[in-house]
């Protein structure tokens, strides 16, 4: 089997490079044909030229997101993806049972076993996401982090942006429709569109999402202050958000989001993804069975 290894050398203070080298050795020892590339230099043309059956991504969620951006609609579903996590949150790996500290020999066995499943993706204009997108406080924090980022990030990288955003939280007044039905009408709050259950700090606002059901899960939490954001964080942590006043949870094929007053930051898979412009609704659609991942184990929270 031909396997491509994509390595984000900035991830994990060099851990991704070490892990990638170990996986390359293990794959060769187990009979695989292997090509290793730096993720930053791996063009779609280079991937196609190698013609891999599987791709091992050594890095964080951003590295997986970059691959999805490159290859959605260009043959992504033909390659079985395994995430060898060395990032900050590693939500993709967590969702699909690709846990950290798995030895290179075991990663090689999982990949060469050639057992996979198809998952959905979310599409918003020219961008796509595997995990989630959101509008609100968290997206504004991500935007702040990306604006000052100079290298790898850790959880501490978010501390100052969170504090600064909390002093004057960006909570847009939104209108939201799912498959044509209005579920939020001119309320301020946080909106998450999830393809999977996982979210940063295990808050998991779309805790019932299934990445293979052909639908996207939506959670809206009404909020107009930093204290209400803290309250929602606590409710999500305890998996009690669904029963709280001000929470709307639904799912569908197409979600339309409109910011009514001012520009609102958007994030996808933990990466800044521009802004919603008043008067220009954003439309998010599900793309069923658009990505293939290594089948490891049943999902766990």
Regions picked out by a protein language model, each given a short descriptive name:
Residues 134, 138, 192-207, 272:
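Glycine-rich phosphate/pyrophosphate-binding beta-alpha loops
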